[in-house]
Each structure stands twice: as structure tokens, then as C-alpha cells.
Amino acid sequence: AIFKSYCEIIVTHFPFDEQNCSMKLGTWTYDGSKVAINAESEHPDLSNFMESGEWVIKEARGWKHWVFYACCPTTPYLDITYHF
């Protein structure tokens, strides 16, 4: 799959600014008892990443989250969020 990500750009300290972006992968329909979401690695595979001459990714990491909502406090909803 190919994913495109956009993040808010803050250029207060241009040209020395740094941005923090995230991409969350999960399901809104199925809970953790019906869907297994696992990351292959804490660091995403960037082999197909298209580099830009204007910026670089300094670091990229991912975490798995279990979220419990008030409607169903014993049912986990899972996602993997990558921060870069």
C-alpha cells in the first residue's frame, strides 16, 4: 500500500525549523478481539520513501496503543502510530 501523509508546518525558526508528524493506522469498526494489528518493527520500513531536497526525516518510530472507551471499558481498540 502507498500512504501519503501531511502535517502542519510551523516555520517560526526557518530555515532551522523541525516538524513533528504522526500517522495512525487502525480500525474504527472492529475492536481488538476481532482484529490483530502488529508492527513488524519499532522503526518503519522507509525503503520506498521518496526523499525531498528540502527536508529529511531525522527519526521515525512506531508504537502500538490499546485504547479503552467509556462505552466499552473492557474492550480494547488497537492502533499503531508512527511519529516522524
Curated annotation (Swiss-Prot):
GO terms for molecular function: extracellular ligand-gated monoatomic ion channel activity; transmembrane signaling receptor activity. Gene3D superfamilies: Neurotransmitter-gated ion-channel ligand-binding domain. Keywords: Cell membrane, Disulfide bond, Glycoprotein, Ion channel, Ion transport, Ligand-gated ion channel, Membrane, Postsynaptic cell membrane, Receptor, Synapse, Transmembrane, Transport. It catalyses: K(+)(in) = K(+)(out); Na(+)(in) = Na(+)(out). Its main location: membrane. GO terms for cellular component: postsynaptic membrane. SUPFAM superfamilies: Nicotinic receptor ligand binding domain-like. It is found in: Postsynaptic cell membrane; Cell membrane. Coiled coil: none annotated. It comes from the Eukaryota. InterPro entries: Neur_chan_lig-bd, Neur_chan_lig-bd_sf, Neur_channel, Neurotransmitter_ion_chnl_CS. It is a multi-pass membrane protein. It holds the Pfam family Neur_chan_LBD. Glycans are attached at N20. Belongs to the ligand-gated ion channel (TC 1.A.9) family. Acetylcholine receptor (TC 1.A.9.1) subfamily. Alpha-1/CHRNA1 sub-subfamily. PANTHER family: NEUROTRANSMITTER GATED ION CHANNEL (PTHR18945). One of the alpha chains that assemble within the acetylcholine receptor, a pentamer of two alpha chains, a beta, a delta, and a gamma (in immature muscle) or epsilon (in mature muscle) chains. The muscle heteropentamer composed of alpha-1, beta-1, delta, epsilon subunits interacts with the alpha-conotoxin ImII. Upon acetylcholine binding, the AChR responds by an extensive change in conformation that affects all subunits and leads to opening of an ion-conducting channel across the plasma membrane. This is Acetylcholine receptor subunit alpha. It comes from Crocidura russula. The lineage of its organism: Eukaryota, Metazoa, Chordata, Craniata, Vertebrata.
